[in-house]
Amino acid sequence: MNRIIPPENLPELLERAHMMAGVSLAQIAAQRGLNVPKDLKRDKGWVGQLIEMELGATAGSKPEQDFLHLGVELKTIPIDSQGRPLETTYVCVAPLSNIQGLTWQNSLVCHKLQRVLWVPVEGERHIPVGERRIGTPILWEPDPQELQLLQQDWEEIMELIALGKVEKLTARHGEVLQLRPKAANSKALTQSIAEDGSLKMTNPRGFYLKTSFTAMILNKVFG
């Protein structure tokens, strides 16, 4: 399978993304010589990885934007027949220790969400994975109000992490951004700050965008 060369510039990336609109996942997988999974229970990241590969994304699992040279993060978003997001959107792993001096401006969440290429994909479970079609891509940059909401949630969540209250944080915290356990395996552990300031072990957490927020982004474009 030939590796796709990363796009040289933003117009080239957008052209590639627009060329995928209306195409099924099975068609793209066939071009790349890949098998389509029967369902996504064990292959949750398969759709995102397929789109990343087809567009020539470079980051893989590294903590940086997918198209670092273009300043663009790629996010696939499963939608229903009404164009509404079906699930929250993973942004990045949340730091639970060594967070002194970390600010919103130098956080990975801020870096990743500076400019996002959203690629909607049909996600309703009754549609076989291979038959699901890719939608029209959206290049999004948060406006001042969206940035303020993101920053506010991030700062409140990070303050609770710094106070050792990570266990008290639930998915209900935050208007647009939430913190949730990240690992598929609940035995995975990482260091976090305890309430007395020492370090303790806990499950890794990730930052996720709530569906109400991503629905707002899609609505602005598609109405």
UniProtKB/Swiss-Prot annotation:
GO annotation terms (biological process): DNA modification; mismatch repair
Name recorded for this polypeptide: DNA mismatch repair protein MutH
Chief localization: cytoplasm
GO molecular function annotations of the record: DNA binding; endonuclease activity
Record key words, sorted: Cytoplasm, DNA damage, DNA repair, Endonuclease, Hydrolase, Nuclease
Function, as annotated: Sequence-specific endonuclease that cleaves unmethylated GATC sequences. It is involved in DNA mismatch repair.
Top-level lineage group: Bacteria
Organism placement in taxonomy: Bacteria, Pseudomonadati, Pseudomonadota, Gammaproteobacteria, Alteromonadales
SUPFAM superfamilies: Restriction endonuclease-like
